[in-house]
Amino acid sequence: MVALLRGSEIEVKAVEWLWKPMIPFGDVTIVQGDGGDRKTTMMLTIAAKLSKGILPPSLEDGLLVDAPTIAPASTIYLTTENKAGSVTVPKFEKAGGDKDFIFFNNELEQHMTLTKEELTEAIDITSYRD
């Protein structure tokens, strides 16, 4: 059975941004693009900065605005394309990341096998936020 909610049943909350207006805190973010677009490099650079408590600048009214610093935070980086040991960890290190603040899936498959419950648990385990 499909579970549906009316809009009137949903509590509206303000978005807390990791990178305004691109990436919200605490949500799954999927990046798609052509090979060679530097998706991995961009996301691992953001994760590396986040591991040091540095947020990317926000885009507000067409201008880049410096974001405040925060406590170092974790990233769960899931991929079906790159191996952690040969691609993602070296790129994360090159960007200056603290390896204690990044977590990777332990499998390289075409399809993710994490259930919603497993992903929620992973976020809870690695989260520094309430």
Task: Identify what each model region corresponds to.
Residues M1-L18:
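N-terminal pre-Walker A segment at the start of P-loop NTPase domains
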